[in-house]
Regions:
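Divalent cation-coordinating acidic motifs and surrounding scaffolds
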Residues: 1-185
Length: 185
């Protein structure tokens, strides 16, 4: 079962890079920090290489909801501290998965983790969700869809199999993030 393969970070580390909500470290960096005025090429190169490396190490039990939430959990402060800014920043949680979510805890618990990290900003108003996901998750109200709709605005999504829509979905998600930044901050 899934629980045989799942150890939440609150019960100790499984020592796997990028597991349990910890950032995937690539090239000595757990995430790439940049400014909108910087040359985008280094970010693109780092992200492309990190995504390929992470994809090759993944498991068939995909738990993106747990991963997105445990990023904000205090148990992951040693690797993730400083990644989520509470004040003056909108958080875009973007899912890129070709499998339905298999995270074991209830959606309400995962939602609370992210809300706790964005209290000063305004909670729901400062968290947006988007993603390239399997088309089935909405229709069956799968856990991933429940999580993506648990925050303020409707998620921006596209079918992971429709590669032609990738740019449009990412562009809309980034535009919504910038729009919300102007509205709420």
């Amino acid at each position: 079962t899934i629980l045989k393969h799942y150890i939440p970070p609150t019960q100790g580390s499984n020592a796997v890079n990028g597991s349990q909500g910890r950032h995937f470290e690539h090239g000595g960096k757990p995430y790439f920090s940049t400014n909108t005025s910087d040359d985008p090429a280094p970010l693109k190169n780092w992200f492309t290489a990190a995504a390929k490396a992470a994809g090759e190490l993944g498991c068939s039990f995909e738990m993106p909801v747990a991963a997105a939430s445990y990023v904000a959990h205090i148990a992951n402060n040693p690797t993730n501290f400083g990644f989520i800014r509470d004040e003056d920043a909108v958080l875009l949680v973007f899912f890129l998965t070709d499998e339905p979510d298999k995270s074991p805890e209830p959606v309400v618990d995962y939602r609370a983790m992210l809300l706790g990290a964005k209290e000063k900003c305004g909670g729901d108003e400062c968290i947006l969700t988007a993603g390239l996901i399997p088309s089935c998750v909405e229709g069956i109200n799968q856990k991933l869809w429940q999580y993506m709709t648990a925050f303020g605005e409707a998620p921006i999504t596209g079918d992971i199999k429709d590669t032609a829509s990738y740019g449009k979905v990412i562009g809309e998600a980034l535009a919504a993030t910038l729009g919300d930044t102007c509205l709420y901050l």
